[in-house]
UniProtKB/Swiss-Prot annotation:
Compartment(s) of residence: Plastid, Chloroplast stroma; Plastid, Chloroplast, Plastoglobule
InterPro entries: ATPase_AAA_core, P-loop_NTPase, RCA-like, RuBisCO_activase_AAA_helical
Family of this protein: Belongs to the RuBisCO activase family.
Annotated function: Activation of RuBisCO (ribulose-1,5-bisphosphate carboxylase/oxygenase; EC 4.1.1.39) involves the ATP-dependent carboxylation of the epsilon-amino group of lysine leading to a carbamate structure.
An example molecular function term from Gene Ontology annotations: mRNA binding
Coiled coil (residue ranges): none
Stored Gene3D superfamilies: 1.10.8.1070, P-loop containing nucleotide triphosphate hydrolases
Gene: RCA
Residue sites binding ATP per the record: 165-172
Record PTM Phosphothreonine, positions in chain: 78, 283
SUPFAM superfamilies the UniProt entry points to: P-loop containing nucleoside triphosphate hydrolases (SSF52540)
Organism for this UniProt entry: Arabidopsis thaliana (Mouse-ear cress)
Protein name, UniProt field: Ribulose bisphosphate carboxylase/oxygenase activase, chloroplastic
Length: 474
């Protein structure tokens, strides 16, 4: 204990020289409590000398700040330093903090926003502007487009994706939704552009459109070539269609592009510089009508699109999203028409507006429709959204189905060739009792009834409908 006391008492009591009273820097007292490290104190640490400089406050003119200022980005800095300034506000002495809201001390993001954006998780959302995208459709299209922009080792990726299926199932519209969600502005082509009066023009057009898309990709914008209804323009629909040289050249051009996607040349020129690879998306109803070597697996990846019940319900919810129809009514409506295409429900919704249009025509007059709609100083007419109910949709849906049945049942072309009669053209109207005694007018005009037989004694020449009252004198 004595040794400990003597050690504690052995403190260097040399006077500490400050303010220039000693020579140089001196050592601070050291003890076992402070350790053996020597701490040097500057001789000018507490100088009473005052500065002769003046303090100036300057205002920066915003109009003189240029876009080329090397420090202008600091005002929008969202690094961790800026967040620390925000978090430390109110927790640190104000002496050590710069005023908030001045230049770089203004944090653009709050701490919560910064953390939430940093930890944000992205998922494959299958909605675009309120419209439903089928997950299987979106998966196939996104994977195909992405795969064509990647460099996969020792793998030959098919350039063309052929989406085919029944009519009116939303193939083209679903493609547009997926591309819009991916930020792609595609180069569009239709089946009508695959035929021309000049031999070779459609094949040249395909190469031009492909190179246009390649130029956009070269500029840093994702793009693709989208061909609508390929089978209608390049396929053979039976003996009634003629196979022309343009059909042959379109098939050959697509085959050549699929084999050499980075070396697509225009007729009459050759450029050694390679172009960007552009994925091609094709839609159609029946790809069995296309040239078989074109649709082989190495060139075209095929996808048969048949929407499930969930897909049909999801698309119909997007169609009727602004009509305040209950979800259970939409499900029932879809189940009531299981064999109809998705396009049927879009036509059904448009059919409900017929009543509003009819009221507009009656209020304006048939003679004034042209001046009101085509050459009018007034704006376009505004219609109130009609009330849509399940009962009204079912009524119009049954009417559309009846028209479809008429087309399949009557087949007037064959009837005209076989006989000089109308066949069963009016069978549906006769069965409903709406054929006799009524004309084709849209308004209820009185039809005079009476005896229409000239041989009868009570023949009425003004009668337009026979009521069965003819009297004969034998």
């Amino acid at each position: 204990m004595a040794a400990a006391v003597s050690t504690v008492g052995a403190i260097n009591r040399a006077p500490l020289s400050l303010n220039g009273s000693g020579s140089g820097a001196v050592s601070a007292p050291a003890s076992t409590f402070l350790g053996k490290k020597v701490v040097t104190v500057s001789r000018f640490a507490q100088s009473n000398k005052k500065s002769n400089g003046s303090f100036k406050v300057l205002a920066v003119k915003e109009d003189k700040q240029t876009d080329g200022d090397r420090w202008r980005g600091l005002a929008y800095d969202t690094s961790d330093d800026q967040q620390d300034i925000t978090r430390g506000k109110g927790m640190v002495d104000s002496v050590f903090q710069a005023p908030m809201g001045t230049g770089t001390h203004h944090a653009v993001l709050s701490s919560y926003e910064y953390v939430s954006q940093g930890l944000r998780q992205y998922n494959l959302d299958n909605m675009m502007d309120g419209f439903y995208i089928a997950p299987a459709f979106m998966d196939k299209l996104v994977v195909h487009i992405t795969k064509n922009f990647l460099t996969l080792p020792n793998i030959k990726v098919p350039l063309i994706l052929g989406i085919w299926g029944g009519k009116g199932q939303g193939k083209s519209f679903q493609c547009e939704l997926v591309m819009a969600k991916m930020g792609i502005n595609p180069i569009m082509m239709s089946a009508g552009e695959l035929e021309s009066g000049n031999a070779g023009e459609p094949a040249k057009l395909i190469r031009q459109r492909y190179r246009e898309a390649a130029d956009l990709i070269k500029k840093g914008k994702m793009c693709c070539l989208f061909i609508n209804d390929l089978d209608a323009g390049a396929g053979r629909m039976g003996g009634t269609t003629q196979y022309t040289v343009n059909n042959q050249m379109v098939n050959a051009t697509l085959m050549n592009i699929a084999d050499n996607p980075t070396n697509v040349q225009l007729p009459g020129m050759y450029n050694k510089e390679e172009n960007a690879r552009v994925p091609i998306i094709c839609t159609g109803n029946d790809f069995s009508t296309l040239y078989a070597p074109l649709i082989r697996d190495g060139r075209m990846e095929k996808f048969y699109w048949a929407p499930t019940r969930e897909d049909r319900i999801g698309v119909c919810k997007g169609i009727f999203r602004t009509d305040k129809i209950k979800d259970e009514d939409i499900v029932t409506l879809v189940d009531q028409f299981p064999g109809q295409s998705i396009d049927f429900f879009g036509a059904l919704r448009a059919r409900v507006y017929d009543d509003e249009v009819r009221k507009f025509v009656e209020s304006l007059g048939v003679e004034k429709i042209g001046k009101r709609l085509v050459n009018s100083r007034e704006g376009p007419p505004v219609f109130e959204q009609p009330e849509m109910t399940y009962e009204k949709l079912m009524e119009y849906g049954n009417m559309l189905v009846m028209e479809q049945e008429n087309v399949k049942r009557v087949q007037l072309a064959e009837t005209y060739l076989s006989q000089a009669a109308l066949g069963d053209a009016n069978a549906d109207a006769i069965g409903r009792g709406t054929f006799y005694g009524k004309g084709a007018q849209q308004v209820n005009l009185p039809v005079p009834e009476g005896c229409t037989d000239p041989v009868a004694e009570n023949f009425d020449p003004t009668a337009r409908s026979d009521d069965g009252t003819c009297v004969y004198n034998f």
